[in-house]
């Protein structure tokens, strides 16, 4: 298949929009079913993730049955009861008020697994860092998540589950690792910011605090005041619609620059 080497401006903006507007969704699910053709597109996008040694270690268990969802919800309740005991006082009250899953509300639940034996005992590129197959499967999850956002479908990752018990519920072999349990469905709206940020659990860290030049500790924020390396030129010309090179800024650049400024305050 022949591919174009360049994205159009509209295509490029769409990619960044999907990234910036991706949300971990636990509420606002609609009963509207996800068509099989759309679900196949999402899974194909996931399947086109990069993987160590082209191992493609992922499998996808698509769950629609309400009885299965109810059983998984019970696993969540059990695990969440134990998890909530870790937090006391105001933090505990805040935790107990969070909605951390949409298992029964979402039309589709999706279990993403990693077959760590796929490709044999010697997978190209995995001999030193064995966990690269798990990292590869995470790339598949992110591909699906961004494609889902482009389709108007919300995705929520349910991380508070006992994976060994989950494997018994949906028949995953012992030799296969459960990596993610996701809730998928069309939603009435996507929130403007992550739920945990809205609830006051945590804030987004300014990216400049996380970027080190050449060696650990040499942070760009020490040199560049606002702490967002990706949008330095936009800040310099803010309000004039041009970036550092003089090129007219696109809407996604203006939006993401605004996000950066809000997070850095």
Go through each PLM region and give its residues.
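C-terminal helix-cap and adjacent tail motif
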Residues: 2-11, 18, 25, 181-225
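A glycine-rich helix N-cap at a beta->alpha junction
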Residues: 80-88, 172-195
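Generic structural concept
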Residues: 43, 66, 261-265
